[in-house]
């Protein structure tokens, strides 16, 4: 499964949004309606899913789905 698809699954589950609402260009807060607590929970779920640690300083930079996918892709290399 591609990183985008795995991220999308986590986002759909954590934010209770429709799968077709999650696109690479979707902004987590603006487009998907997440609040700050949602973002924290989303980051924790992503850390668990991908078995990585995302420092708070990096998590703050994850604005869109593409930011998340690119960040996780970078960690997996």
UniProtKB/Swiss-Prot annotation:
<dbReference type="GO" id="GO:0000036">
    <property type="term" value="F:acyl carrier activity"/>
</dbReference>
<comment type="similarity">
    <text>Belongs to the acyl carrier protein (ACP) family.</text>
</comment>
<dbReference type="InterPro" id="IPR009081">
    <property type="entry name" value="PP-bd_ACP"/>
</dbReference>
<feature type="domain" description="Carrier">
    <location>
        <begin position="1"/>
        <end position="76"/>
    </location>
</feature>
<comment type="pathway">
    <text>Lipid metabolism; fatty acid biosynthesis.</text>
</comment>
<keyword id="KW-0443">Lipid metabolism</keyword>
<keyword id="KW-0444">Lipid biosynthesis</keyword>
<dbReference type="GO" id="GO:0009245">
    <property type="term" value="P:lipid A biosynthetic process"/>
</dbReference>
<dbReference type="Pfam" id="PF00550">
    <property type="entry name" value="PP-binding"/>
</dbReference>
<dbReference type="GO" id="GO:0016020">
    <property type="term" value="C:membrane"/>
</dbReference>
<keyword id="KW-0596">Phosphopantetheine</keyword>
<keyword id="KW-0276">Fatty acid metabolism</keyword>
<keyword id="KW-0963">Cytoplasm</keyword>
<keyword id="KW-0275">Fatty acid biosynthesis</keyword>
<protein>
    <recommendedName>
        <fullName>Acyl carrier protein</fullName>
    </recommendedName>
</protein>
<dbReference type="GO" id="GO:0005829">
    <property type="term" value="C:cytosol"/>
</dbReference>
<dbReference type="GO" id="GO:0000035">
    <property type="term" value="F:acyl binding"/>
</dbReference>
<dbReference type="InterPro" id="IPR036736">
    <property type="entry name" value="ACP-like_sf"/>
</dbReference>
<dbReference type="InterPro" id="IPR006162">
    <property type="entry name" value="Ppantetheine_attach_site"/>
</dbReference>
<feature type="modified residue" description="O-(pantetheine 4'-phosphoryl)serine">
    <location>
        <position position="36"/>
    </location>
</feature>
<dbReference type="InterPro" id="IPR003231">
    <property type="entry name" value="ACP"/>
</dbReference>
<keyword id="KW-0597">Phosphoprotein</keyword>
<comment type="function">
    <text>Carrier of the growing fatty acid chain in fatty acid biosynthesis.</text>
</comment>
């Amino acid at each position: 499964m591609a990183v985008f698809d795995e991220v999308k699954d986590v986002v759909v589950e954590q934010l209770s949004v429709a799968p077709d609402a999650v696109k690479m260009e979707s902004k987590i807060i603006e487009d998907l309606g997440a609040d700050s607590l949602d973002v924290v929970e989303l980051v924790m779920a992503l850390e668990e899913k991908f078995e990585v640690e995302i420092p708070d300083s990096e998590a703050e930079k994850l604005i869109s789905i593409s930011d998340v996918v690119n960040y996780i892709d970078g960690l997996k290399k």
